[in-house]
From Swiss-Prot:
Pfam families tied to this protein: Lenti_VIF_2
One Gene Ontology cellular component annotation held by this UniProt entry: virion component
Similarity section: Belongs to the ovine/caprine lentivirus group Vif protein family.
Protein name per its UniProtKB record: Virion infectivity factor
Locations listed in the record: Host cytoplasm; Virion
Principal location class: host cell
Keywords attached to this entry: Host cytoplasm, Virion
Domain of life of the source: Viruses
Keyword Magnesium appears in the UniProt entry: no
Gene expressing this chain: vif
Extent of the signal sequence: none
Length: 230
């Protein structure tokens, strides 16, 4: 009986514990220098823990309506909506069955092109946003004005910072370019490529590019990226 009480008490104590450092970031940098480590060592370790402690967000079923299955990602701050055509799946033509919502319109993802051509960047918009939607970084309270005066968010990985910039600024704008330069030296966190492909349903679109997962998006690509949010 005593053992059970101690277990409950310890569980409540851990549940109330806040995630995050109790010292400001500059203090952690000073600590890093004192033990001959890189100044971003704490941010790197902490971000990795935040990203993979809960294995990120997942794709969840919402409803079935008029021949489509509707799904959405579980993250509240970056919610992506996707659907798949049940008629195409019945015809075993699952390659073009998935669509994602971009600025109120449905766009097809996972198209297989039969004629030769340069299709390398055709799906960049989806995989850019999909990477951020899956990441478990807490994207609440991100203020673009505070970011402009140098208040960097230590608890966001580089991909999520780039995503917030794309979401809150216009493509090819001077404002976006300036903010991307601020985030240029932020530490990039690798996300395993299987996270892009492994979802709760079979026959999901195949991620063909490691960009955003094992290789960071370039400044040029982020500058030109169209946001899916209205």
């Amino acid at each position: 009986m005593l053992s059970s009480y101690r277990h409950q008490k310890k569980y409540k104590k851990n549940k109330a514990r806040e995630i995050g450092p109790q010292l400001p970031l500059w203090a952690w940098k000073e600590t890093a220098f004192s033990i001959n480590q890189e100044p971003y060592w704490y941010s790197t370790i902490r971000l990795q823990g935040l990203m993979w402690n809960k294995r990120g967000h997942k794709l969840m079923f919402v409803k079935e309506n008029q021949g489509y299955e509707y799904w959405e990602t579980s993250g509240k701050q970056w919610k992506m909506e996707v659907r798949r055509d049940l008629d195409l799946i019945a015809q075993i033509n699952f390659r073009n069955a998935w669509q994602y919502k971009s600025q109120g319109e449905w766009k097809t993802i996972g198209v297989w092109y039969e004629s030769p051509g340069d299709y390398k960047g055709k799906e960049n918009q989806f995989w850019f946003h999909w990477r951020i939607a899956l990441c478990s970084c807490n994207k609440t309270g991100w203020d673009i004005r505070e970011f402009m005066i140098g208040k960097h968010r230590w608890d966001l990985c580089k991909s999520c910072i780039q995503g917030e910039i794309v979401k809150n600024t216009n493509p090819r704008s001077l404002q976006r370019l300036a903010l991307l330069h601020l985030a240029k030296d932020h530490v990039f966190q690798v996300m395993p490529l299987w996270r892009a492909r492994r979802v709760t349903v079979q026959k999901f679109s195949w991620c063909r590019s490691p960009m955003g997962y094992t290789i960071p998006w370039s400044l040029q690509e982020c500058w030109e990226m169209e946001s899916i949010f209205e």
